[in-house]
Amino acid sequence: MTAKYLPYFEDQKIKPFQNQSNSGQRILAVEAEHDLRQLTAEVLIDAGYQVDVAENGATAWSALQLSKYDLLITDQFMPKLSGVELLRKIYAANMTLPIIMATGFLPTWEFALHPCLQPVKMLLKPYSFQKLLGMVKNVLHTTGSAGVEIPLLCKSHIEHESAIKL
């Protein structure tokens, strides 16, 4: 039996999300769990974002090569290509989009210690949709369309080792 990390609701009443004008910002949401993937997409669409979904890192990588996104929200543990493996490919290709990684397994201290993962924002599962939307808004507001610069230490790490090692 596999564990499912669905978002939790902070109170009994489910509050509808206001459809705010988010200038059609495009988000790629990557989640292995079908129900969570669909719920996440619905919440983001209701908030005014354009959303594409992928069920694993390999599908996400294909989408990233074909389209431009303003934000990537990715799961960590997925079949075919994990979240960290997806980050390796993104950084090796010099893509600079902001990234939120949602996980219930990877401790945040591991991210803090690795220079390649410092631009990545962590969203620990289970999370509320309000927390997800708050983080999305914050990340998009602080980075805008410019994306996130890959840290210099990360660039040299990729050039010399071609990998992010955790």
Question: Residue spans of the language-model regions?
Answer:
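Non-catalytic signal-transmission and effector/linker regions of two-component phosphorelay proteins
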Residues: 1-26, 130-166
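Charged docking surfaces used in two-component/phosphorelay signaling
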Residues: 38-46
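Short hydrophobic/Thr-rich beta-strand motif most characteristic of the beta2 strand and flanking loop
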Residues: 48-55, 63
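Acidic catalytic/metal-coordinating carboxylates
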Residues: 55-59, 82-85
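Active-site beta3 strand of CheY-like receiver
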Residues: 67-73
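Receiver (REC) domain active-site loop signature in two-component systems and cognate sites
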Residues: 78
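Alpha4 helix (beta4-alpha4-beta5 surface) of REC/receiver domains from two-component response regulators
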Residues: 85, 106-124, 130-134
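Hydrophobic/aromatic residues positioned on beta-strands within the core alpha/beta folds
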Residues: 102-103
